[in-house]
Amino acid sequence: MTTNTVVREAQSQAEYNPLAKQKAAAKLSRIPIKVEHGEALKKPDWIRVKAGSPTTRFYEIKDILRANKLHTVCEEASCPNIGECFGKGTATFMIMGDKCTRRCPFCDVGHGRPDPLDTNEPLNLAKTIAELRLKYVVITSVDRDDLRDGGSGHFVECIKNIRELSPLTQIEILVPDFRGRDDRALEILKAAPPDVMNHNLETAPRLYKEARPGSDYQFSLNLLKKFKALHPKVPTKSGIMVGLGETDEEILQVMRDMRAHDIDMLTIGQYLAPSNSHLPVRRYVHPDTFKMFEEEAYKMGFTHAAVGAMVRSSYHADQQAHAAGV
């Protein structure tokens, strides 16, 4: 099989607009790696999503989100489970805009110079959650390397507003790594800690340079360990993708590293390339292998492990949390 190397030439200064949201090829043209593509692997039957007809609830949620100028990672990251989750009245809200300061080549969230924070967003988010009568919410964000606190203060404002309007709603936050600002961010989060603290490791350390440029494996592990030391009763959680070129043993070692850093909950799912411009799928992991990962997770002491081809970090997050005793 012949492998074609796609070398993405940098856009000229005249073409590049840092204020515009860049997606796919436009986003990845300026990263310092070569994205190599061979013949695309055929998707096996076990990873196909059952497409259902959009429900009234699906459209209701989309209308409410647009009316309140809110974003979901479900939409921005092209999650394959969006139909099911929206249809059941659940969503993962993405705060601080829809332009990320990073250019991870596995991710479909747009890149660009972020807009100033919307000071009305925490209240709008809280009103939306109350209107939808959600009992469990996940709040994530784009990376905001432009902010001195990495956006941690905005997370706190969102949590406070949600608890004011929906005191019984449980809140999971899926945070960026707060690169270089972790101690400041953790200090700020003390004002309103979540019910579950989630930060994804994404892949094995060997693949970080390719998959997570600008991030550091040990830094991400330490972020969750530091949070756990400050809030020992709050469950910590992390997720891994498979299919980027890692081995089974590398996944097991990441799991061991997670437990060594006091991470309680785990998600593992199959990586699916959002477009032909993104990192290609190197392998499709068989359900039997996912089952092995799940069994090993419980042997290692994880309180809950959601493992399977279509599992995503916030997929059935409420069920994951409740199974872990939240």
From Swiss-Prot:
CDD domains: Radical_SAM. [4Fe-4S] cluster 1 binds at C74, C79, C85, S314. Residues 85-303 form the Radical SAM core domain. It is an enzyme of class 2 (transferase). It comes from the Bacteria. Pathway: Protein modification; protein lipoylation via endogenous pathway; protein N(6)-(lipoyl)lysine from octanoyl-[acyl-carrier-protein]: step 2/2. The keyword RNA-binding does not apply. InterPro entries: Aldolase_TIM, Elp3/MiaA/NifB-like_rSAM, LIAS_N, Lipoyl_synth, rSAM. One of its GO terms (molecular function) is lipoate synthase activity. Its main location: cytoplasm. It catalyses: [[Fe-S] cluster scaffold protein carrying a second [4Fe-4S](2+) cluster] + N(6)-octanoyl-L-lysyl-[protein] + 2 oxidized [2Fe-2S]-[ferredoxin] + 2 S-adenosyl-L-methionine + 4 H(+) = [[Fe-S] cluster scaffold protein] + N(6)-[(R)-dihydrolipoyl]-L-lysyl-[protein] + 4 Fe(3+) + 2 hydrogen sulfide + 2 5'-deoxyadenosine + 2 L-methionine + 2 reduced [2Fe-2S]-[ferredoxin]. Pfam families: LIAS_N, Radical_SAM. The keyword Metal-binding applies. [4Fe-4S] cluster 2 binds at C100, C104, C107. Its cofactor is [4Fe-4S] cluster. Its EC number is 2.8.1.8. Belongs to the radical SAM superfamily. Lipoyl synthase family. This is Lipoyl synthase. The gene is lipA.
